């Protein structure tokens, strides 16, 4: 077990507010970490743009067989949110595998 994996498991066990779930289609990854999801909507000359400031970390072993690719739309449910209405959509802007973990940098879904 790598240092990163041990740290992930320790944080997951001790800081319950940082826990989240990730949903990719019908697949749900129940054990993930997220420090929070910051949402911002700003007015520009082109109209309103939404942005999200968030990073999500999960164990590489929990990642689906066909790894989560950049551009994939996922949903995140932070600990304590309603399971019916609390899911937040985000697009994977970057994927960074390190020491048994995968970090996903998220951005807004502008549809």
Task: Report residues per predicted region.
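Short alpha-helix capping/helix-loop boundary micro-motifs
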Residues: 54-64
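Short, compact, well-ordered microdomains
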Residues: 65-111
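N-terminal disorder-to-order initiation segments that are Gly/Lys/Arg-biased
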Residues: 1-55, 94-111
């Amino acid at each position: 077990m790598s240092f990163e994996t041990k740290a992930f498991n320790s944080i997951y066990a001790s800081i319950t507010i940082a826990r989240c779930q990730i949903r990719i289609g019908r697949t749900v990854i129940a054990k993930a970490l997220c420090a929070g999801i910051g949402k911002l909507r700003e007015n520009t000359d082109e109209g309103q743009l939404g942005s999200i400031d968030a990073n999500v970390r999960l164990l590489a072993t929990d990642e689906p067989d066909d790894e989560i690719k950049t551009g994939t739309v996922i949903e995140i449910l932070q600990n304590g949110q309603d399971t019916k209405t609390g899911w937040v959509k985000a697009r994977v802007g970057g994927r960074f595998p390190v020491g048994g973990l995968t970090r996903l940098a998220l951005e807004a879904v502008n549809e």
